[in-house]
Amino acid sequence: MFGIIKDWREQRILDNSEFTADDWTRAAERIVILERLNKDELNRLFDLATLFLDDKSITGAQGFEVTDVVRQSIALQACLPILNLSLEWYAGWSSIIIYPGSYKSASTTVDEFGIVHEGSQHRSGEAWLRGPVILSWKDAKHSGERDGHNVVIHEFVHKLDMLNGRANGFPPLQPDMDPARWTEVMSRDFEDFQTHRKSGLDRYGATNPAEFFAVLSEVFFETPQKLVDAYPDIYDIMVKFFRQTPLEQAS
């Protein structure tokens, strides 16, 4: 019964979408990494993005105007990681805040002597546990250009990671995945990345396991060959986690 009601509600949202299929097609054409998707995959992505926009509010900060182009771009890229999962992976929070450019955010760090330092940092995005996703449009508008950097995917992958209670590079895995294998591969390659530079992989990923997972997820969707070249085992487990094969689709 609940499934029937859910399906009916979602179909009603899709039937009353403010954007047509042509609107979504034009939006997708502006995002290079979506070129690898076939027609059926694009249609599913459009449906997911429509449901996403119904479920999440997107508001501007510091006077930023959230246009349809902004909403479509954020929705399409946010939904790419869950294309073969479901919108339920983004449950438990409701808002996205867009700044025109990088913004200052309070930060707390603990040094090697255990002293706590309070300060602020300029950020291009962040994701809060059970809270909003915050993005800089100056950075987000260049996401999806197949250059290995995608702040939208980065922050929304943090949301997937947080489903286990905190961002630690260990999201809830698919039923057919081996948690021990995930831990072994991610831990081994994170340790390697802390001491060895890899072409096409942002050094920010060496910060901690959560950032490692998010940074490599960017590469998985943007420039998958770079990930295969650097860490083939991580590419393989991400294929199983995201249920997507971007390298095969791009060829």
Where would I find each of the regions flagged by the language model?
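Short, charged early-sequence alpha-helical segments and their helix-coil boundaries
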Residues: T59-R71
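Charged, compositionally biased N-terminal leader segments and the immediate start
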Residues: M1-D22
